[in-house]
Curated annotation (Swiss-Prot):
Protein species of origin: Draba nemorosa (Woodland whitlowgrass)
Entry's localization field: Plastid, Chloroplast inner membrane
PANTHER family: PROTEIN TIC 214, PROTEIN TIC 214-RELATED
Region Disordered: start-end pairs: 251-275
Lineage: Eukaryota, Viridiplantae, Streptophyta, Embryophyta, Tracheophyta
Name of the featured protein: Protein TIC 214
Miscellaneous: There is a partial copy of the N-terminus (positions 1-344) of ycf1 in the inverted repeat (BAF50422).
Membrane topology: Multi-pass membrane protein
Amino acid sequence: MMVFQSFILGNLVSLCMKIINSVVVVGLYYGFLTTFSIGPSYLFLLRARVMDEGEEGTEKKVSATTGFIAGQLMMFISIYYAPLHLALGRPHTITVLALPYLLFHFFWNNNKHFFDYGSTTRNEMRNLRIQCVFLNNLIFQLFNHFILPSSMLARLVNIYMFRCNNKMLFVTSSFVGWLIGHILFMKWVGLVLVWIQQNNSIRSNVLIRSNKYKFLVSELRNSMARIFSILLFITCVYYLGRTPSPIFTKKLKGTSETEERGGTKQDQEVSTEEAPFPSLFSEEREDLDKIDEMEEIRVNGKDKINKDDEFHVRTYYKKVSENRDGNKENSNLKFFKIKKKEDHFLWFEKPFVTLVFDYKRWNRPNRYIKNEKIENTIRNEMSQYFFYTCKSDGKERISFTYPPNLSTFFEMIQKKIPSFTREKAPADQMSAYWSLMNEEKKNNLKNVFFNRIEALDKKRSFENILEKTTRFCHNETKKEYLPKLYDPFLHGISRGKVKKLLPFQIITETYINIGLGGSWINKIHGILLKINSKKFEQTLEKFNRKSLSVEKKLSFFSEPREEKSHSDEEIQIFKILFDVVITDNNNQTLIKNVIYFHEINKSVPQWSYKLTSELEELEGENEENVPTEPGIRSRKAKPVVVFTDKESHNGIYTNLKDNQNFDQKDEMALIRYSQHSDFRRDLIKGSMRSQRRKTVIWEFFQAKVHSPLFFDRIDKLFFFSFDLWGLKKTILRNLMWKKKKKKIDKNEEEQLKRKERRRMEIAETWDSFLFSQTIRGFLLVTQSILRKYLILPLLIIIKNSTRALLFQVPEWSEDLKDWKREMHIKCTYNGVQLSETEFPRNWLTDGIQIKIIFPFYLKPWHKSKVQSSQKARLKKTKDKGEKNDFGFLTVWGMETELPFGSAKKKPSFFEPIFKELKKRIKKFKRKPFWVLSIFKERATILLKVAKEIKNWILQNLLFLKGKIKNISKQNRMPLFDLREISELNETKKDSIMSNQMIYGLSVQKKSMEWTNSSLSENKIKNLIDRIKTIKNQTEEILKEKENLTNTNRCNKPRYDSKIIESSKKSWQTFKRKNIRLIRKFFFFFKFCIEQLFRTIFLGIINIPRITTQLFFESTKEILDKSIYIYKNEENGEKNKNKKNTIFFISTIKNLISKKKIFSYDLCSLSQAYVFYKLSQIQVSNFSKLKAVLEYNICITSFFIKNQLKDLVQEQGILDYELKDKTFLNSQVNQWKHWLRSNSQYNLPQVAWARLVTQRWKKKINQDSLVLNQSLIKTDSYEKNKFDKFDNYKKQNFFEANSLLNPKLNLKKDYRYNLFCYKFIHSREKMFDMSIGIALDNCLVSSFLEKYNIRVIEEIGHRKYLDWRILNFLFIKKVNMRPWVDTKSKKKDSRTKVQNYQKIDKITKTDLANKKSFFFDWMGMNEEILNRRLTNFEFFFFPEFVLFSSTYKTKPWVIPIKLLLFNFNEKKNVNKKITLKNKGFISSNEKGSLWFYNLNKEENGLAGQGELESDNEKQRNPESVLLNQEKNIDENYAESKIKKRQNKKQYKSNTEAELELFLTRYSRFQLRWNCFLNQKIINNIKVYCLLVRLKNPNEITISCIERGELSLDILMIEKNFTFTKLMKKGMLIVEPVRLSVKNDGQLIIYRTIGISLVHKNKPKISKRYKNIDKKNNYDCFIPENILSPKRRREFRILICFNLKKKNARDRNSRFDKNIKNLTTVLHKKKDLDKDKKTLIKLKSFLWPNFRLEDLACMNRYWFNTTNGNRFSMIRIHMYTRFKIH
C-alpha cells in the first residue's frame, strides 16, 4: 500500500512538473506578467471609460477595448513574424510615425471647443469618432512601454522565444495570458470607480456637499478632457526627450573616415601589418610604396562608392588607354568606373534612410579617443571578431572569428551568380565526414612523423629529414618567388611592415615603373563583374594560361595513394579560379603609363576617434595644430584671467606672427569649473545623452551624478527614509558625552563632507540662475563699502566716546591703525586674489569674491605692548597660528573661511568685559574668607599633633604584644615549630631568588629543586619522620576514643550509625586535606608567581639588549657600507668577524630566528658535545627545546646521525621522524611524481625563508654550495655558448648572410634550441632537498629577496639593480656602445648614448663594425671597477635587442650607482671636477656621455666627457657651459652635462634637466606628492596678489604665518635640480607600468633570457671558441622535425581523440605514447642512468592534456595573435616526465 501511494505521489509530482514546464503554462505566465508593463495606451482606454457615457459612450468603450487588444495582438505576432517585427522594432520608424500623430491629437483635443458638439446624428461613419478611438488605442499600444522603470516585463516573451520550440503555441498562450491580466486589471479599475461613486463617506463629506465645492467637482468633471490632454502632452515631451533624433544632432567637422578592409587582422596591427589581399602585381618589396591599400578617406561624405551592394573594386590609373586607330576605348575598364547616374537621387534617398531609419546613424561617434599608445579607432591588440556560419565539430555553428574576406567574397558570388547555391548535408553525415577527415589527417601526420623518425634511425642526413616550408613560385626556371609579404604560406617573423602612404598622396610619375605588356585582368573580377558584352565562354578561350607553381620538397600529401579522375568541368573551374591572373595577347589596345591596383573590398564605416576635449582647446589656444572645434564636451569651465602683463615689449621681433601679436597683452589665466555636477562626463558631440548610462536627477541641487542602481546606497532626502538609528546615536551622544572633547572620527568626517556639499549647493545656486552673479557682485561690493567706510568707523566712534564718558583714555590711534590695516581684495569666483582696486574681468557674469585680510574686530581695550613673560609670548604665537586673519565676505555682510561657507564666529566685544568683571568679583569675594582660611591652617596643625600621639600609643601596644608572644613560644608544639622553619626557608629562598642572575645556556642547572634552603637533607628527613609519628599518635588516640564510645552503646550495630561513622571519616579526611591545602596554597601561589617572574624578567632583560644590539649593528653596518662601498667582500667579512657582539640568546630557537648575527659553525659542533649539553638538562625542562628541534628538523639533520635520533626518540626527549624518507624515485602517483620533479615551481626552502623574512644560516648555504661546485662550474653547454660570441660577431650572422648560408642558419637554430633544452636540466643531481638549496632556482631566490630594516644596508652596495624596482622604457631607441680596452690597466669606462629616430629595421652596419669583444658575463660580481658599462648584444636574435629589454633580462650590466647617477649629489669631499671648455662641437662629431668611476685609493678621474643630443643639433642651439662646481662623494658616479646657451634662446638649468630627464634616459611617472596639490594652488593664489602689490613684505609675512604661503614650494633658487625636489618630497619618481607592445622576436628573446641564470663563472676556457664547427643538430629535438603549422595541427587532432574519448585513462595513454616514441628513438631502457650523453625526450612535445595546448588552440583557432610564440615559453614550463 505504501509503495502504491508513493508511486501515485511520484506520478503526481512528475505530472505537475510537466504541466508547469509546458509551453502553454509558461506562455500564460509570461503573458500575464506583460500586463504590468503599463504604457501610454492606457490613457486612451481610461479616458473612454471615465468620460464617455450613454450609447455613444458604450460604443467608444467597445472600440477602445478592441483597438487596445488588437494592438497588443499585433505586438505578439511581430515576435513571430519577421517583417512585422522589422517594421515595429525599428525605433525611428515608430518615432517618425508616433510623434506627429501625438502632437496632432494633442492640439485637436485641446481645441475641441471650437467644433460644433450639438446633437449628433446616427450616421457614425460620417462622424468617424469611434474609428478614431479605435485607431488611437491601436497605435498607442504599438508604442514602447515606458511608465515602469524596467522594460524587462514587456521583453520576457521575446526572451523566452529562444528557448521555446513550439513558437506559435507559445505566442498564442502568452496573448491569452495577457488578455486575462488585462481583463482583471480593467475590472479592478471599474470596481474602484464604482466604489468611489457609491461610498457614502466620500459623498457625505461636508466639503463636497457644500455649494462652494460642488462647483469645483463639476468643473473637474467638465475639464477631464483637458487633464487627459495634459497627460498626453507630457507623454509627447517624454518621447521627445528619449528619442534619438538624428536630424538635429551635430555632425562632427572632422573627416568621417571609411576604412577599406579586405584582409585579415594584420591590416589593423602595427607590428605585423600585412597586405590585405595577396597581389601578384608587385614582385619586389619596393612596390609597397606604390600601393595605397589600407585606407580610403571620404571627406565630409562626398565620395559615395557604389552603395548598392556595398562592394566595389578600387583602381588607380593615370591615363586612359588608346587603341592603335586613335579611337578612345576603355571597354576593358568599364567595370572600374563608378556609376554617377545615381548621384541625382542619392542626395534624397540615402540621407533620408540614414537619418530616419538607421538607428546606428552614420555620424554617431565612437568612444575611441586618441591616446599615446593607441592611434587607431580599434586597438591593435584586440582580436578580430567577425560573425559568420562555419562548420565546426561536424556541425554548422556561428563563428565569431570568421575571415571577413571569405564572407565578403561569398556574398559577392551569391549576388553575381544566382545559380550558386549550397546543398546542406544532414547533420549526421556532416559529423561523420568531419570525424573521418580529421582521423585521416591525424593518421597521415602520424605516418609522416614516424617515417621521418625511422629515416633518422637509418642514419640519413638530418637536413633532408626536416620538413621544409612551402612558398609560392611563379617562375620555375628562374625560381622567382612571390614576395614574403604576400605569401600566405609564410607567416610570423618573415612578414615585414607595410608602409602606408600619407593621406591624399598622389601617385606621381616616379611610381609608374610597370612594364608594358598585355592587359592584366583579375579573373575573379572578370567573373563577378561584367567586363564587356562578350560571353563568358568566349573569354575563356582567350585565356593564356600562366599557372602558379608551388615548390614543395617534403609535403605531407605530396604522394597520394590513389589517383583520382577529374571531370572536364572541374578542371575548367580549377583553371579559372586558381589561375588568378591571365593575359590577353589578342587584345589590340596599347596601354601607356597605366598603373592598376585591384582589390576586393567592402566599405566599413569608421567612426571619428581623434577627438579633443573643450579643456584641451582652452589649454592649447596659443598652440599650433590644435583642431578649431573640440569633439568632446568637458566639464563646464571658464578661463579666469588672473594677471595681465601691461609692460611694453622691448625685444626685437623677427617673426611675422610676433609682429602681429605685438599689441596684444600677455595674460595668465586659470580655469574655473562650475560648482555643480558634471552631467556631461566627456560626452562626445553628436551623441545622445539618452543612450548613456542613466544619470537621473532627483534633487534640485545635486552635488554628484548617480545612477539609479546605487539609489539605495546614497544619502536620501527625509521623505525617502527616516534614519532612526542615526537619531538614536545622536541622542545618546548628547546625553553621555556632552562635556567630553570629541575626537575626529568618521562621523565628524561625514559632517565635514556634508558642509562641503552644502557649500557646493550654494555655489551652484548662484551659478545656475540668470543674473544671479550680477546681483551677488553688486551686493558684495555694497557690503564691502558699507563695512569699510560706514559700519566700522561708526563702531570706532561709539566705542571711544563711551570710554571717554567712563573716564578712560580713548584709543583712537590704535583703532584707526587696525582699521587701515584691513584690506578688501577682489578675487575671482574661485578665490584667486587680484588686488584692492582691480576687478576681475567679466566679474558681473563670471562672479566675484571679496577677501578680507586682517579683518578689523572691535576690542574694548588694547593690551600694552610690554610682554610680561615668556609664557605670554608663547600663548600669543600659538593664538596667532590658530587664528585665521582672513575671511571671505558674504552677501549678508558676514565672514566665512571659504567662499559660500558657513559664517565665521566673530570675537565678542563684551566677552573680555565680562571676564574682567568676573575676576573683580572673585577678588572681592576672597576678602571676607581670609579669617576662615587662617583658622583652617591652624586646625590642620592640631590634627597632625593628635595623629602623632596616636601612632606612639599604638607602637607601644604592639611592643607589649610581641613580648607576650615570645613568652608563649617556649611552650609551643613541634608542629608549629615546623611551620616556623618553613617560613624561614621561604624568606631565605626569596632573598636568594631576588639576588640570582639568570643567564642563557651558559648557566647550568644542577638540580630541579624549587628551594635553595640552607638546611641539610638529614634535617629535612628528621622533620618528615617527626610529622609521621605525630600523625600516627593522633590517629591512635582517636581510635581509642571510638572504642570507648562503642562499648557504651548497644552491641548490635545499627545502619544509621554506620552512615554516621563513614560520613565522619570522610569529613575528617576532607578537613585534614583542606588544612594541608590551606597551609600549602600560599607557597604554591608564590611558586607560580616566581615562575612567571622568571619568564617576564628574562624577557625584560633581553629586550633592551636586543634593541641596543640591533641598533648598533644596523647603524655600524650602514656606516661601514656607505664608507666602503667598493671594498672587496673578503675585507667586509673580516670586518664583520671583528665586531663586538652581545650574546644574549638563551635557546636554539632564538639562534634560528635571528637573521644576521649567526656566525656559529654548526658543522664544527661535535655530536658528543651536543648530547652532553642535552643530558645536563632535565627532561621535564626540555619542553622548550623539544618544539624547537622538532620545528627545525632540517637544521638538526646536519649534525645528528639517524642512530642518535632514534636513541633520543626512545628516551622520550624528542618525537622525531625523518621527513625525507620518501625520495623522488619512490613509487607514488605519476601526477604527484611529475609535479615533484618540476623544481622550477617548487621553490626551495631558502626562497620560502626569505618570503617569511627568516634569514637562513649563511655558513650552511656556503657549505652546500661548495659541495655542489661541480654542478655550477661544469663544462656544460651553456658556458660554451657565450664563448662563441667573438666568432659569431666576426661571421656576422644577420639576415643577409642567413639567406646565403642556410646550413649555418640551421646549425645556429638548433644550437639555440639545444642550448635551452640542455641548460634547464643540466643540473639534476640528487641531493638532500631538505637543505633547501636548489641550484636551478638561484634566479627565483634572488628575485624573492624582501628588504627589511636589518638588511636595508645591503641595497646600497648591491652589484646590480633589480629591474622590478624601476621599469625603464626609452622614448627613443638608445644605442649603448662600449669603448673598453681590456688589455690596458686604466680603469676607464664610458658609455655613449645616441638618439635615433624610430626606424623600421635596426641597421646592421653599426653592429657589424663594432669592436669584437668577449663580454665578461660571469665576472661581474668580483670587482666592480673593472666592469664596463656596455650594452651586451646578446647572441640570441641580436637584431631585436633594445637597451630596456637588455636591462630587464640582465640587470647586472649597470650598477645602481651608475644608473641613478643624476640623483646622488653629495657635498662631502672637496674634490672638484671640471669639464673641458670647448667652443663648439662639430656636426660630424658624435656626442658621448661619460660616466666617472672614482677609485678610492687614487682619488683620480676616470674620464671626462660631454653630451649633445640630435634634437638639439636640429634646432642648432649653441650652448654655453654653466660654470657649476659640484662636489662628488667617493664611490659615487655622476654625470656632468655640458650646455651652451644661445643669446636668442635662454634655458634654465631646471628646463635643461627636465628635457634631459624626459627625453634621453627613461620614462618615469613624475607625480607631485598628494598633499602638495592644495598648497600649490594656495601659493598661486597668493602669487597673483603679491605681483600687484608695491610693498608686499607685510602681506608675505602674514601669508606665511597663516600657512597660505608654504616656503618649501617657493622656487627661490634659479638652478633648482631634481635632487632637491626629490629630497623635499615634492617630486616622486615612480616606475611606469606602460602597456608596451612587443613583437614576437622580443618575446622569444626574453623567454630565452629567463632560463639563462647568472652564475659565478669567472673564467671560460679558450678551447671552446670553435664551437661552430660542431654539428649540434645531430642531437636533434623531435618537435622540430615537423613545421610549426603541422605541429599545431597534429596536437589539435590528437586532442580531439575522435573515436576513443573514454577508452582509457589519460595517464596510461600518455605513458604508452612516450614509451613507443622512446623505444624508436633510444634503444636503451633506462633514461635516468646516463644524463650527460643522452638528449632526453621532453613530455611537452606531446601536450595531450596540458593547459598551454588549450592556449595554442585558442591562438590557432580564434586568431588572437599570429605565429607560434608559445613554443619557447613551453620550454621552461615543463620538464621531462620520468619513466620507471
